[in-house]
Amino acid sequence: YFRGYGNKVCVFFLPLRQIRAMKISFISLILILLSFVCQSQNEERTLVEAQLNKQGEAIILIKATDEQTDTLSRLVSLDGKKGNEWKAYVNQKQFADFLNLGLDYRCLPKEETKSVSMANSISQMESWNRYPTYDVYVDMMKDFENRFPDLCRLDTIGLSENGRLLLCLQVSDFSNSETVKPKFFYSSSIHGDELTGMVTLLRLCDSLLTSFESDSEISNLLSSTVIYICPLANPDGAYAGGNSTVANARRYNANYVDLNRNFPDPILGLHPDQEEFQAETMAFMNYAKKERFDVSVNIHGGAEVCNYPWDCWQSGQREHCDKDWFLEICNSFISDVREFSPIDYFTDVSYSGITNGGDWYVINGSRQDYHNYFLRCREITLEISTSKTPQASLLPRYWLYLGKGLVNFVSNSTKGMKGIVKDSVSSLVLDSVRIEIENINEDELFVYSKADGSYFRALLDGTYQVKFSKDGYEDKHICVSVASNGTTEEVVLMKSTDVSIEQALQTMDKSLIYPNPANDFLTIEINSESYYDVIDSRGIILQQGRLDVGRNNIQITNLQNGTYIMRLYGKDKKHPNKTMTFIKQVTK
């Protein structure tokens, strides 16, 4: 043992017995500390398992570096960062897989809902300071349609795993069918315990419908847009404790699957969470493919921020081609919200109130990325309350903060370019025409015309060179100017490179489809199993079905006299591989 005194060094010799004693004491101290750590982790594991046994899901806080979160996000359902710890939800399987990582964690008690005041009738929802029971929720959606049949239509997206209804209210001035209307989709509570948005969207339905006659901004909005509103995307999670209460609401669905990790992912493919598609996921995917939304917002709780794409990439890895557009509409929304809210609202994630999804934290399988990447629908995720299920008496405050912003978000995001694409000779509308903004790298995220020939492309103000393209047609180039806060409408006529309809009727293979003109029956012979639909000149599907190999007789007595198009599809039913024209002509 050495010790210095000034310029002298003194040497002390400790007895060997004392050195051994010190060594043993040090080892003992380490063992004691390790035992405390093990005991602590065992206690946390016991708490987590108790939550899992009671609720089927548990919340944990995990100590992990940013580098470890890539692996972590594929095993658990990350829900944000608290200091230097990551908040995550786990089910039984996820927790077992997580334990193999050997990371430190602790159990987080589930957020207590201080006051779950439930409405047992529609009249009890008049003050908007209660949560509806499941039956009242369904009754409210039906009541909107019954009271305002000219302004809304109630649609069923599908059924949950437990058979509860996934409802959507289509709100628009349906008497005005002359203009092309962009389709906007609001949905909430894909995580069943995030219920601020559920009540807020119910109130949005009520406000739009009751204000239509008296508010010119609302009437103008509904005359030019179709707004789809699904207040509750995960009813099994919201009413996990039974249809009469949301007191035991949980994040996951009935199978303890996070629905916002269950969609196809741009990086990890069809099943990023290693789970089968849930009934809710399939329903929303099919509904989105059918309706072909232009803009969408998925409302969550647990934070207060506008989250724009991507979720699976950080901004340094890949940016959405419409990043500037996303930032513009999000900034407008934040400005509207801060006009009516406390100064610290929408500041818990970033002071601006806006974040890139992956820069906040990376996840895979989100609906936002699915809509943007696979369906070309511009969607953001909107987190509206740090408390996932606030006490019911606070719910009116959130409408005060958000009401104007939610209405204006629809208006602002549906500005740009819209119109109809038609065949220049027959004037038949054209489906699946690609609309490409030239001189801009759109990263293959082009929009396409719909079955009725209509299209919408969200754009900031400016002048754009636009190309319309479709197999069998010459490319069409036009110059479009979009004014500030305006929408430019263009009818685009495209010239076919195929033979004309008249020529096609003269040279058509009579052994394939006959007679032509037809009376009450049409015969078609095909070489492989196919699916078909029949559309009119507006692109409206009037009839559809399946065709077997060989001769098929199709009854067309329901069709009026006129010219129709039959489209044949393969088993994927995605794009027609053959199009034929026939005439329905009943002679008297």
Regions flagged by a language model, labelled:
Residues 1-5, 14-15, 504-514, 518-588:
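C-terminal outer-membrane/trafficking sorting elements
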Residues 2-3, 9-52:
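Bacterial Sec-dependent N-terminal signal peptides
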Residues 178-328, 335, 339, 343, ...:
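Active-site/substrate-binding loop(s) of hydrolase catalytic cores
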Residues 296-320, 352-411:
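Active-site-adjacent mobile loop/cap segments within catalytic or ligand-binding domains
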Residues 417-424, 453, 492:
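A short, amphipathic beta-strand motif
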Residues 429, 437-460:
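Short, acidic Ser/Thr/Gly-rich low-complexity loop/linker segments typical of extracellular
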Residues 453, 462-472:
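A short, solvent-exposed beta-strand micro-motif common in secreted/extracellular proteins
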Residues 471-496, 581-588:
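Structured interaction patches on ligand/partner-binding surfaces of diverse proteins
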